[in-house]
Amino acid sequence: MSGPASSTGFHIHAEGLHERNVQPSKPTSDGGVAPKALDDKSRVEEDERTDSEKKTFGRTPGGTIFTVPPTRDMVSQLLSPSEPKNLSDIFVLAIISCHIFLLRFLPSSFRVAAFAIIFLFWRAAYNIGIGWLLHMQSNGRTLVCWAKKSNIFVNPSTGRNPHPVLYNLLKWELETKIPEQYSFEDAPTEYNTWLVFRRVVDLILMCDFTSYCLFAIACGGRPAGEGFIMLALRWITGMSLVLFNLWVKLDAHRVVKDFAWYWGDFFYLIDQDLTFDGVFEMAPHPMYSVGYAGYYGISLMAASYKLLFISILAHAAQFAFLVLVENPHIEKTYNAPPPRKRVAVDTDNVKPQDDDVSQDSSVINDNEYSGKAVATLEPSSMHNLLGPHNFDLYRITDSSVLLIQILFSALAILTPSTPVYQFFFVLNAALWRVWYSVGIGYILNRQSHCKMWTRHFVKYGESNQEAWQQWKGTYHLSMTMTYASFIAATWKMYSFPQDWGYGLVLLRHILGASLIALQIWTSASIYESLGEFGWFFGDFFFDQSPKLTYSGIYRYLNNPERVLGLAGVWGAVLITSTKSVISLALLSHTLTIAFIQLVERPHMQKLYGQSLRRDAGLVRSLKRSLPPSLKQFHGSVDKILDDSIEFIEEFIEAARPKLAAGVKTFVKDTSALFQKYPARITISRLEPDLAGYDQKDYSISLEGTQSSEPAQFERASDKEGEKARSMPDRRGEQVNLMFEYGAPIKVKWTAPLNHSKKDWIGLYMVTDNTSREITRISSQGRWIGTNKASFDSLTCEQGLISSDIVINKFREDGEPKDVASGEMVFSGDKLWWTQGVFEFRYHHNGKHNVMAVSRPFEIRIGRFDDDAIYGDRYGLVRAAIESALLPVVQNCFDRDPDIAPQTVEEQYGSLVDRNGKYSRRVVFAVHQMFGIEFAPEVVRADGNVRNLAWRICNAKKVLAPYSMSRTNGATTPTAEHES
């Protein structure tokens, strides 16, 4: 696990807040820049060549190119006397002064509680308030929509700005702050919106920091009986952390400037490459990780557990902000999925590979679907081991792990904590640790040198893939047993404190829990970077080694498990403070380092050679900051360590014991895990005034792709009564509306000419609403506004084709009348991805009053009937499955040309691997069509329709004796056969 990440399935991307890598790449969500815009930019650059000062160019989602003027940082603008001040600066300084006055005049008994509430308020304004604004801006460009709807940046002389006073105030405010290269009238709306957003952020961040410092002053004190040495250590350590925090902030701002500091890429992008060094080579997300070291330094100087707990809460909230707001936007903007290769695959030359572990399955040749050739070309499965979402009781590895964990827990809890039991639990933990490092290390060493593990399975006729699966189970069981035994031993040695306030008891528990959390995060980061292949040492088993990429946590550390990967072990030492646990921790750390040096490192050097880097980002940063004398000392220490390790390797090679490796075969099944999402509850809003609107002027009509004939004729099958086995005779009625699963649906609507511009149409299940006048359930995003720029989000405009086209319509009473009409298309996430009967509802003025309801229509997936296919059963059935499956898969992939295949051989787009909703749609459709339930990972592993069709054929053959449908194959033996 110490190796760098595989290049398959993982890409290096920029870090979080204030540290995203501002590349000149195009954002993936809103399209690129028009050619005309690029020509405009070329002309601008040509005009500016004579300018000695290098300028930065910004690019809005609409393609507008503009010059980004230089700005100053927040602290300089507010506190520097040389910087011009305006009303917003005075307002921020006044709010900060109010906080200071509160500390001065509040009674001492109320200060702590009052400033705790004040700080939590500003922290909530930061993480929840700013987080919500950025989330809405990222997904629907809400802030820019607000600005455009209110016309606050439009010159009042045009007559379109109803707020001339606000316009003049904003113009004076912003031009005072940016005196160079900036014009309020000429700047795009996105940039002006960002500048206003900056002022709000300045207020929140300054008040957040000020209230925290004042809260620390209110909580500060000196513990009773504290000696001078402890006092000095506490203050020296605290000041060091604060100074380190200050350096992190300054260095981060030096690198990313104001653009990333204030989340500029939520509004526009800049065409500029930034060099990330300094703090960005030391730790992932430094503004969120090491950038909060000052909190703990101040808590240490204040000697207050109240302040420490508040600091931990604030730090956790910041990580939540990163995960929920920053990372999704960064992934969407900078880490676009690579374009799909549309080169046709020569299926005639595909060779079977038993040891194929790639996620890109081979395309299967039509002529090779017979006999044993089918088994050799089976696409690899994607039923991973790690993670709660991959836990499967049908798999022997998972069920064994669960049963053993239950047994260990019962033994640890039910047995007394006597010295005898403590000894055996500690001994058991030590033995498992020895096996995990020495035993597993020996197996991997032999596998690296002579393929011992693989040869054993090949000897018995198994494939390399089977050896790989059995190894994964063995390693997973060994790892879980090692940590379970250590936890059990720690539990036995732990004694519950009688007085949490005595000495450093509470602090030890807090630090211990923090170290445990650090190890969990490190393990998750390692797995995220390496995947299953790297986590289980896949390059020991497969010669087709992937290209090295240092991404994720490996961008900063070469071997994160060397220190951070064992932080939880030392956390247990702090919590228990017993010699036995200290011994286990020392043993674990020593064996882990030996495993890395004696097993992993030689194999990595043999496999990757010179492509291995010597120093990680953190080491490079530290070396640059060391004086020359210490650099030479570091080199000498490295030489001594290398010589010592080489001596140990030679000694072990000469005296290595012969270990017998007996491994039993495990049974593995695949089952699906579906995640259920809770329903969202909303309160219906009623429009009080509906006078002047005639509901006869409103109408909705539908157009869609009709479902297949099997789906339409299922209602008239022989399972019905005799009179119901034929299609119903419709007398003067329209045909039944039955649309394909996932196919786009076009909605045509009419409304009065004076209808509200905030009208909208939503998609619902018929059974969800009992009232035809009011909708009392949320559309859950399945709605589109009838007019553009009427709502505060762009997502509600996706699918809108036309609006307010005047047509002459005959009403139900026969009277002709001019009405407004429009069209929209519901597709993708705006559809229901299940079967049922649905309807569209036209709502009035942004509320839930229903003005028109469409005809009910049904979404139905027809059952595939292969009994009607004769001749070459396998070949014809598989071809028929491919033909039936291709349009369904295309619908499941939103008919997006970047991910939806055009032929059965074409590979899926890479976005299918990133977003699990696509594969879940496909497995639902397959289940309804063929009665076969797959896991979503199967769809991603197969990679194209042909492989998926083969898997369905194979599953139908395997499950044929248990099928509930008619079949021409073998059935249960009759009495005649038995006799």
UniProtKB/Swiss-Prot annotation:
It is found in: Endoplasmic reticulum membrane. The keyword Transmembrane applies. Residues 1-63, 335-362, 704-729 are annotated as: Disordered. It is an enzyme of class 2 (transferase). Residues 12-21, 37-56, 343-354, 715-729 have a biased composition (Basic and acidic residues). Its EC number is 2.1.1.17. Keywords: Endoplasmic reticulum, Lipid biosynthesis, Lipid metabolism, Membrane, Methyltransferase, Phospholipid biosynthesis, Phospholipid metabolism, S-adenosyl-L-methionine, Transferase, Transmembrane, Transmembrane helix. Belongs to the class VI-like SAM-binding methyltransferase superfamily. CHO2 family. This is Phosphatidylethanolamine N-methyltransferase. The gene is CHO2.
